[in-house]
Amino acid sequence: MRASRPAVHPVEAAPPPPAAAAEGPEAQVEGAAHPRGVRMKDPPGAPGTPAGLGLRLAQAFFAAAALAVMASTNDFPSVSAFSYLVAAAILQCLWSLLLAFVDIYALLVKRSLRNARAVCIFTIGDGITGTITLGAACASAGITVLIGNDLNICAENHCASFETATALAFISWFALAPSCILNFWSMASR
């Protein structure tokens, strides 16, 4: 029989054993071990938790801010590293917003995102977007240092905007790193 498996599973608490309730509070303390097969709660920052949603929204916000600051300059297309930063910020913003919507759905229906396939997709996506965002931020930082410190041509360029966009891209990556690590840990601990 083929049956579909949803990406979100209900979180159900196991009822207390009837024998412990009948014996009194002393028996409850002694038999306080969790029954076999009960999982611990999702760690803060995992998909489907309020902290996970906060991390996703922070990722999207800082990526969108980096995109807006870089796009506000008229000469960013002349440097390939800055164009790469814009493309990476767009990808990061879209990925983070997509997963934020998944987190919102899971929170609204009070479900946990513990499906192995979903966690694997989240981990791979976070790893790819994180690598791209970090690479773009590092490349932009290198060009910004070259323009500002080595060539001393900040007078005719938007160095402050370039530095701000680069810093925002790094902050977006720092918000992505805990999500990626928690997803990888969750996937590896299965």
Swiss-Prot record:
The keyword Plastid does not apply. Residues 1-12, 20-31 have a biased composition (Low complexity). Residues 1-31 are annotated as: Disordered. Keywords: Cell membrane, Membrane, Transmembrane, Transmembrane helix. Residues 72-81, 148-164 are extracellular. It is a multi-pass membrane protein. InterPro entries: CASP_dom, CASPL-5. One of its GO terms (cellular component) is plasma membrane. The keyword Nucleus does not apply. The chain crosses the membrane at residues 51-71, 82-102, 127-147, 165-185. It is found in: Cell membrane. Residues 1-50, 103-126, 186-190 are cytoplasmic. It comes from the Eukaryota. Belongs to the Casparian strip membrane proteins (CASP) family. Homodimer and heterodimers. This is CASP-like protein 5A3. It comes from Zea mays.
